[in-house]
């Protein structure tokens, strides 16, 4: 058993509490000075980035407002950093103070320990006197240690509360910064989407305008070509009515639906026999200019049929053939303006008529007046043959 049977356990208890306060020198917050310097430098740069007198207007005001928000954000971060440094420094000082108090109490007990040991050597009453001596010193030392620990606990609670406040403020700043960033990103995305939509709208409008111009150009080109075609047919005598049916083709481009009879409504006008004689004017004397019209041929045949048959059957046939030859020759001369052309032939003379009459009065075609004559083929001119069969 140790002679300092009260002081030694007390010193051991103080050593244990001292070990709970940590090993080494407490950090005074110097690790946060680097971040504080960064914030201060950022504040200086932001302060220098404000627009000067040479930049005015809404853009400058908007930029200045954004820059001011950044300055306020970094300023609040710097203040939080300073408060956190102060809090850490205060807590480190509290721990160091407690350590110093415990160290002093331990040293005080170690100082009186030899006296307590010497008192134990007194006969009979030595241990009692030593115990009476050690007890007050140990009690006083433990009271001081308890006070130091209480101070440390209270200081730690205060600093912990302040730390929670700082963390709440930091979270608020970060949330505001994130909201600002998200707002900026949302504005950027909104602007990009607006520009993309405007580009698509302009592109569609441009395509519509291009389509309208293209269809207008094609329609105008077709209209001009059709007008030129109508002008060409209008300048040709006898074909002015031929374009009435073809003009229906334009309805294929302007009508909502197609009709099978829209373009064929006037097709009969092209095949009409009344319009065929008008073709004599095509080419000014070439082509069909020498041929008589159907109406003229019909009128000539009618007049020939009404003539008296004084010369007999053969004479009538010959006279009919001669009349038709004269009619064809006359029509050819009138259509061509003279002997030029396919139908331009001289009128047959009286001598040729007499010769033809004599030709059919003699030979195999001849017969008695009361008898039935055989069929006679007579050349009407122009390669036409007339078969005459008369019964008296």
Swiss-Prot record:
<keyword id="KW-0843">Virulence</keyword>
<dbReference type="GO" id="GO:0005576">
    <property type="term" value="C:extracellular region"/>
</dbReference>
<keyword id="KW-0964">Secreted</keyword>
<keyword id="KW-1015">Disulfide bond</keyword>
<feature type="region of interest" description="Disordered">
    <location>
        <begin position="302"/>
        <end position="392"/>
    </location>
</feature>
<dbReference type="InterPro" id="IPR043796">
    <property type="entry name" value="ESX-1_EspA/EspE-like"/>
</dbReference>
<dbReference type="Pfam" id="PF18879">
    <property type="entry name" value="EspA_EspE"/>
</dbReference>
<feature type="compositionally biased region" description="Gly residues">
    <location>
        <begin position="334"/>
        <end position="344"/>
    </location>
</feature>
<comment type="function">
    <text>Required for secretion of EsxA (ESAT-6) and EsxB (CFP-10) and for virulence.</text>
</comment>
<protein>
    <recommendedName>
        <fullName>ESX-1 secretion-associated protein EspA</fullName>
    </recommendedName>
</protein>
<comment type="subunit">
    <text>Homodimer; disulfide-linked.</text>
</comment>
């Amino acid at each position: 058993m140790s002679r300092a049977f009260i002081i030694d356990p007390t010193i051991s208890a103080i050593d244990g509490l001292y070990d709970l306060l940590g090993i080494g020198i407490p950090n005074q917050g110097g690790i946060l000075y680097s971040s504080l310097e960064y914030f201060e430098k950022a504040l200086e740069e932001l302060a220098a980035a404000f627009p000067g007198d040479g930049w005015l207007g809404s853009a400058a005001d908007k930029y200045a407002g954004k820059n001011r928000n950044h300055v306020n954000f970094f300023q609040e971060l710097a203040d939080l950093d300073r408060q956190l440094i102060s809090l850490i420094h205060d807590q480190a000082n509290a721990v160091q103070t407690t350590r110093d108090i415990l160290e002093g109490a331990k040293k005080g007990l170690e100082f009186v320990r030899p006296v307590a040991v010497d008192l134990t050597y007194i006969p009979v009453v030595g241990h009692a006197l030593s115990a009476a001596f050690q007890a007050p010193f140990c009690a006083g030392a433990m009271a001081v240690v308890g006070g130091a620990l209480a101070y440390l606990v209270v200081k730690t609670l205060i600093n912990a509360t302040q730390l929670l406040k700082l963390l709440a403020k930091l979270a608020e700043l970060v949330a505001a910064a994130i909201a600002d960033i998200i707002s900026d990103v949302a504005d950027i995305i909104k602007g990009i989407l607006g520009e993309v939509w405007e580009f698509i709208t302009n592109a569609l409008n441009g395509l519509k305008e291009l389509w309208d111009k293209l269809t207008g150009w094609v329609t105008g080109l077709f209209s001009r070509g059709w007008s030129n075609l109508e002008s060409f047919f209008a300048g040709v005598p006898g074909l002015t009515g031929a374009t009435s049916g073809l003009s229906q083709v334009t309805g294929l481009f302007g009508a909502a639906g197609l009709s099978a009879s829209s373009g064929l409504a006037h097709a009969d006008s092209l095949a009409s026999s009344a319009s065929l004689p008008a073709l004599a004017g095509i080419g000014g004397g070439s082509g069909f200019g020498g041929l008589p019209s159907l109406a003229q041929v019909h009128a000539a045949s009618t007049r020939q049929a009404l003539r008296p048959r004084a010369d007999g059957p053969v004479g009538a046939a010959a006279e009919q053939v001669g009349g038709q030859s004269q009619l064809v020759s006359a029509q050819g001369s009138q259509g061509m303006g003279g002997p030029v052309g396919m139908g331009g032939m001289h009128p047959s003379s009286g001598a040729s008529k007499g010769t033809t009459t004599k030709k059919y009065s003699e030979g195999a075609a001849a017969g008695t007046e009361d008898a039935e004559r055989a069929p006679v083929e007579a050349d009407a001119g122009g390669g036409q043959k007339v078969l005459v069969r008369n019964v008296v």
